[in-house]
């Protein structure tokens, strides 16, 4: 006889809450319902193995079907089923799961019971206007019953016509969720969430191309692999098995570099396979490729909190029943087990890298460029991993040779130790753009390493803290003599007037760009040194590079690029510029410079008159004279600058020297480059 009742919940509002907020993604309902069906099937296997069920188990599978016309999705199993009393106990009492009780009773059995989250069944109401449960227990003399509920706390329970044991969950999909009535949608979700469940999941028939269209065959379409690679013993797997499994997970990805097979049962349960992909120079594109499973049930691909952040760059599968989940299984909660699991995975990754480095260094070096970003990220974010990685991290020099920390220090400390005892590591970030700077260093007997990766600016700063008496300097950050200071700088023999004149002449021809700032500087580099070159200060450039990845450093990223235009005051060409100015311009500047000298002398007298007086005690006439003096000085300086600027604009040698320096630093482009070529042809 039919029976009506009220579901045992504390509030009439529980169903709207379930419908909207139980899970972040409504599609999770399919995983929950199919997982429950797998649970019921696993229970039957367990009961059979312990002799509590002696009947024929038959073909144990879970079948999923969609009826677009009837607007239903049905999930059927041939598991233990339920009696009327069990329906009352397990379905009508929200937050109590039969799997929880079953686990307690058979806790020593190996059967995997995944439905221990309490509310899983009720996820069906997120997409359904009504849910029917037709079920028949495996027990002898059991009769079938049908439970129906429309999403309110009221339900009906009545006898049903069902010949076999097991359960059919029939979800009547509401208008709002019609997308789930598309077979392609359901097949995609089954592939995502149920790909490795332990019981065969059948969804329709396999199809083939026939008579100009796709048609069903007689073969069942099994969605899942019930024995995926990570559940097997490593000894039973060949390299090709691991690669084939990787291709099944990531069909569009390149072949992995190598992998780690995880298999731990104490003090926590953890299995899985982690693959090292070829990591490109972009961290964000690589994330969220590790899939988390709980007893072969897909949970999420967002594993932050389970593994250290740098390990999210790996690919593969982690399966553990010891990772706590909230009611939705979508968000992870931190606990002691998670920390142990995280530490274990980090250790296994470091072990694997060190093993390859020690046993097959040529292969390790060959794959280093694809590993480097991953290793650097780990060193920057995980202290324990840094300690391990310090043994196998590799520097690469400009010729492609690779060295460990100790090897490289031994190589360079003899010639690259400065006067203060610091070992200076020279590096370039652009092999071609910084070629001239690299060549100068090489000619001096220095080694230059290539650090052109996304994280290299951060690694450089970290290593300066970690490595004793070590300083990293980019090869274009200063003149060659100053990169590794062996002695005090040579004195620049220019008068103040000559310095000021050269500054004005070269500033007049420097490019006008809001994003670039140039400062004219002077060095005594010898007559054989370059006449002019461009350097970029190490600190500011490094801060700008680091700002690209650290929002908190955005201030540096917004500053213009700052360069030094270094004039070699010993070079004949610089002397020629200065001599030309003295011959062509200085005669017309004699009176102006004399006037400047007079004005400065007058200014000094006025300042003397103000000494010891409060502002209100200074005569008005003195204040006015001081203001007039400043105006006259500015006017006279302006006249001098105008003449120097005009001379510089017409002087092809100055323009040529500046453009050569810009060209050597990769800063000469577009119209400026075209003009340089035209001018060079004229000069030739």
Curated annotation (Swiss-Prot):
It is found in: Cytoplasm. Residues 549-684 are annotated as: C. InterPro entries: HATPase_C_sf, Heat_shock_protein_90_CS, Hsp90_fam, Hsp90_N, Ribosomal_Su5_D2-typ_SF. GO terms for molecular function: ATP binding; ATP hydrolysis activity; ATP-dependent protein folding chaperone; unfolded protein binding. SMART domains: HATPase_c. Residues 1-329 are annotated as: A. Its main location: cytoplasm. GO terms for cellular component: cytoplasm. It comes from the Bacteria. Residues 330-548 are annotated as: B. Keywords: ATP-binding, Chaperone, Cytoplasm, Nucleotide-binding, Stress response. The keyword Nucleotide-binding applies. NCBIfam families: PRK05218.1 (NF003555). Belongs to the heat shock protein 90 family. Homodimer. HAMAP family: HSP90 (MF_00505). Molecular chaperone. Has ATPase activity. This is Chaperone protein HtpG. The lineage of its organism: Bacteria, Pseudomonadati, Bacteroidota, Bacteroidia, Bacteroidales.
């Amino acid at each position: 006889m039919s029976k009506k009742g009220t579901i045992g919940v504390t509030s009439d509002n529980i169903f709207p809450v379930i419908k909207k907020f139980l899970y972040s993604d409504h599609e999770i309902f399919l995983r929950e319902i199919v997982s429950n069906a797998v649970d019921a099937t696993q229970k039957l296997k367990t009961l059979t193995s312990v002799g509590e069920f002696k009947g024929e188990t038959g073909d144990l599978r879970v079948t999923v079907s969609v009826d677009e016309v009837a607007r239903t999705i049905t999930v059927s199993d041939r598991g233990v089923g339920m009696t009327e009393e069990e329906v009352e106990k397990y379905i009508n009492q929200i937050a109590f799961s039969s799997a929880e009780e079953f686990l307690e009773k058979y806790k020593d059995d190996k059967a995997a019971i995944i439905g221990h989250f309490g509310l899983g069944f009720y996820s069906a109401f997120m997409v359904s206007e009504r849910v029917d449960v037709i079920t028949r227990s495996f027990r002898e003399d059991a009769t079938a019953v049908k439970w129906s509920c429309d999403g309110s706390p009221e339900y009906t329970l009545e006898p049903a016509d069902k010949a076999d044991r097991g359960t059919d969950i029939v979800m009547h999909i509401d208008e709002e969720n019609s997308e789930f009535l598309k077979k392609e949608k359901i097949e995609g979700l089954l592939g995502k969430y149920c790909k490795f469940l332990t019981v065969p999941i059948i969804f329709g028939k396999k199809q083939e191309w026939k008579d100009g269209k796709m048609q069903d065959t007689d073969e069942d379409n099994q969605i899942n692999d019930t024995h995926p690679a990570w559940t097997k013993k490593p000894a039973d797997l060949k390299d090709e098995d691991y690669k084939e499994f990787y291709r099944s997970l990531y069909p569009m990805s390149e072949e992995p570099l190598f992998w780690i097979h995880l298999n731990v049962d104490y003090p926590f349960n953890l299995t899985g396979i982690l693959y090292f992909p070829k990591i490109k120079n972009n961290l964000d594109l690589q994330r969220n490729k590790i899939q988390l499973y709980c007893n072969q049930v897909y949970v999420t691909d967002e594993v932050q909190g389970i593994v250290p952040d740098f390990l999210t760059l790996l690919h593969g599968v982690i399966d553990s029943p010891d990772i706590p989940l909230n009611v939705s299984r979508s968000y992870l909660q931190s606990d002691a087990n998670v920390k142990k699991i995280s530490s274990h995975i980090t250790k296994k990754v470091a072990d694997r890298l060190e093993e390859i480095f020690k046993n097959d260094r040529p292969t390790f070096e060959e794959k280093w460029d694809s590993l480097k970003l991953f290793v650097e990220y780990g060193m920057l974010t995980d202290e324990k991993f840094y300690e391990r990685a310090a043994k196998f991290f590799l520097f690469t020099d400009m010729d492609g040779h690779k060295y460990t920390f100790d090897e490289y220090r031994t190589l360079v400390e003899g010639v690259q130790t400065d006067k203060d005892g610091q070992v200076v590591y020279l590096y370039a970030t652009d092999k071609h753009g910084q070629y001239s700077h690299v060549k100068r260093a090489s000619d001096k007997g220095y080694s230059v390493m290539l650090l052109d990766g996304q994280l290299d600016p951060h690694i450089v700063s970290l290593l300066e803290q970690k490595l004793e008496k070590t300083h990293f300097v980019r090869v274009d950050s200063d003149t060659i003599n100053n990169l590794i200071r062996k002695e005090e700088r040579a004195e620049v023999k220019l008068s103040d007037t000559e310095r000021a004149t050269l500054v004005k002449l070269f500033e007049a021809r420097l490019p006008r760009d809001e994003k670039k700032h140039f400062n004219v500087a002077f060095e005594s580099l010898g007559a054989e040194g370059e006449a002019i070159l461009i350097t970029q200060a190490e600190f500011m450039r490094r801060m700008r590079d680091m700002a690209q990845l650290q929002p908190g450093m955005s201030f540096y990223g917004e500053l213009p690029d700052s360069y030094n235009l270094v004039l070699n005051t010993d070079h004949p060409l610089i002397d020629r510029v200065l001599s030309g100015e003295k011959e062509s311009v200085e005669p017309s500047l004699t009176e102006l410079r004399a006037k400047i000298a007079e004005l400065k002398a007058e200014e000094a007298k006025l300042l003397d008159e103000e000494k010891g007086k409060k502002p209100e005690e200074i005569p008005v006439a003195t204040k006015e004279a001081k203001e007039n003096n400043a105006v006259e000085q500015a006017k006279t300086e302006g006249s001098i600058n105008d003449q120097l600027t005009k001379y510089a604009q017409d002087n092809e040698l100055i323009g040529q020297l500046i453009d050569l320096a810009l060209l050597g630093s990769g800063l000469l482009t577009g119209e400026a480059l075209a003009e340089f070529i035209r001018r060079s042809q004229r000069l030739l």
